[in-house]
């Protein structure tokens, strides 16, 4: 297994090069959307990641699969970058490259990632309200929401921005009340 520090040393140059390419071509937002799509595909189909990480499988087979899966879904320049990762035997880091690219893109564009957990799915109006409040709170120029559901919250919302957690859930309120009564 490769340490996270070593992975960063391997991944950072590729993520930074993709940021530079996207910025230079005016495609940064397109690349970011494509990277989110790639990351989601990797999350939804772990077999794809296993196939790409398998050192026994030839690079040509991996590039053919990348072509089949992503050709009509992502920008051709980004697809070429995935093939380059394959040729350089770095394709096993694709998920990490996606995460690092998105981190750099958010930092470059002053966008914060807000991980929002609720008991039930949020409406578009609720999502917009959360975005506005997070923007006011962080002074960011934009907010990217990652919404998940956890029925154990009972109600309310938990918002995580970086290392900061804002717990406005019923479960959190009950826990704080229990601590006060104890």
UniProtKB/Swiss-Prot annotation:
Gene3D superfamilies tied to this protein: N-terminal domain of the delta subunit of the F1F0-ATP synthase
Stored InterPro entries: ATP_synth_OSCP/delta_N_sf, ATPase_OSCP/dsu
One GO location term (cellular component): plasma membrane-derived thylakoid membrane
GO terms of molecular function: proton-transporting ATP synthase activity, rotational mechanism
Keywords, alphabetical: ATP synthesis, CF(1), Hydrogen ion transport, Ion transport, Membrane, Thylakoid, Transport
Pfam families found in the cross-reference section: OSCP (PF00213)
UniProt topology in membrane: Peripheral membrane protein
Membrane among keywords: yes
Coiled coil: none
Subcellular compartments: Cellular thylakoid membrane
Family of this protein: Belongs to the ATPase delta chain family.
Protein function: F(1)F(0) ATP synthase produces ATP from ADP in the presence of a proton or sodium gradient. F-type ATPases consist of two structural domains, F(1) containing the extramembraneous catalytic core and F(0) containing the membrane proton channel, linked together by a central stalk and a peripheral stalk. During catalysis, ATP synthesis in the catalytic domain of F(1) is coupled via a rotary mechanism of the central stalk subunits to proton translocation.
Quaternary data: F-type ATPases have 2 components, F(1) - the catalytic core - and F(0) - the membrane proton channel. F(1) has five subunits: alpha(3), beta(3), gamma(1), delta(1), epsilon(1). CF(0) has four main subunits: a(1), b(1), b'(1) and c(10-14). The alpha and beta chains form an alternating ring which encloses part of the gamma chain. F(1) is attached to F(0) by a central stalk formed by the gamma and epsilon chains, while a peripheral stalk is formed by the delta, b and b' chains.
Name by which UniProt lists this protein: ATP synthase subunit delta
This protein's encoding gene: atpH
